[in-house]
Amino acid sequence: MRAPQHNSDFSRTVNQLADDPNPYEPEVGSMPKNEFSRADLDNVNKTGTTTIGITTEDGVVIATDMRASLGGRFVSNKNVQKVEQIHPTGALTMVGSVGGAQSFIGSLRAEVNLYEARRGEPISMDALATLAGNFARGGPFFAIHPILGGVDEEGSHVYSIDPAGGVMEDDYTVTGSGMQLAYGLLEQEFEEDLSNDEATTVAARAIKSAAERDTGSGNGVFLCEITDEGVDIHGHHDFDEVV
């Protein structure tokens, strides 16, 4: 597993910052705050979830299930899109509380747009992963554990971002309540240099496997294909359409 911070655009060295624009302007405001108690969190919509990211020969494939639950006991929504585009060639999954994940995605999108406006070029995946880790560690986003996937000049990247802000890059990764079930299939099916089409089938099968036994996952699959040309996201309630 590889940590993205080394030599990233967000490494704080004197040489890097000397000729760069002031990183604190323009300001986007302070982080949102919350005053929820532990009891309140039982009534928060959560995604439960199985989310998967796979690097491929063509780019990256991300897959998620579609279920949201209330307190882990009641299915509150059967059509949740748990992967969102946050970069011209990058996407992030939603894991944890729905509100926290949506706020997290909105904050990252704002920073991505500001970076491009200041520098005239898209932010690299390593820098975006470092920024996402900083947000997860310092912001009030509850227990989120998203996957970031994207393509840049260095190639294809998949990162898992833990609730404490830890960032790890790997060829494939899984997060969420169904991760053990999905990992079992991925360990058998993953091969280097899979095409996007092949990885899509593998990822959908892994989501289906998790949905069979994990009560927090189910109701279909959203598939996200990322290449150097952009991001394509599509949902399927019937697993047979994609496996």
From Swiss-Prot:
Reaction(s) catalysed by this chain's protein: Cleavage of peptide bonds with very broad specificity
Gene Ontology cellular component annotations, sorted alphabetically: cytoplasm; proteasome core complex, beta-subunit complex
Active site: 49
Keyword Protease assigned: yes
SUPFAM superfamilies, A to Z: N-terminal nucleophile aminohydrolases (Ntn hydrolases)
Residue ranges listed under propeptide: 1-48
Swiss-Prot/TrEMBL GO biological process terms: proteasomal protein catabolic process
Bias (Polar residues): 1-16
Subcellular location per the Swiss-Prot or TrEMBL entry: Cytoplasm
InterPro entries the record matches: Ntn_hydrolases_N, Pept_T1A_Psome_bsu_arc, Pept_T1A_subB, Proteasome_sua/b, Proteasome_suB-type
A GO molecular function held by the record: threonine-type endopeptidase activity
Keyword Protease: yes
Keyword annotations: Autocatalytic cleavage, Cytoplasm, Hydrolase, Protease, Proteasome, Threonine protease, Zymogen
EC numbers on record: 3.4.25.1
First-listed, main subcellular location of the protein, grouped into a coarse class: cytoplasm
Location of the region described as Disordered in the Swiss-Prot/TrEMBL record: 1-29
Regulation affecting activity: The formation of the proteasomal ATPase PAN-20S proteasome complex, via the docking of the C-termini of PAN into the intersubunit pockets in the alpha-rings, triggers opening of the gate for substrate entry. Interconversion between the open-gate and close-gate conformations leads to a dynamic regulation of the 20S proteasome proteolysis activity.
Disulfide-bonded cysteines: none
Function field: Component of the proteasome core, a large protease complex with broad specificity involved in protein degradation.
Assembly behavior: The 20S proteasome core is composed of 14 alpha and 14 beta subunits that assemble into four stacked heptameric rings, resulting in a barrel-shaped structure. The two inner rings, each composed of seven catalytic beta subunits, are sandwiched by two outer rings, each composed of seven alpha subunits. The catalytic chamber with the active sites is on the inside of the barrel. Has a gated structure, the ends of the cylinder being occluded by the N-termini of the alpha-subunits. Is capped at one or both ends by the proteasome regulatory ATPase, PAN.
Family: Belongs to the peptidase T1B family.
HAMAP family xrefs: Proteasome_B_A
Official protein name in the record: Proteasome subunit beta
Organism encoding this protein: Natrialba magadii (strain ATCC 43099 / DSM 3394 / CCM 3739 / CIP 104546 / IAM 13178 / JCM 8861 / NBRC 102185 / NCIMB 2190 / MS3)
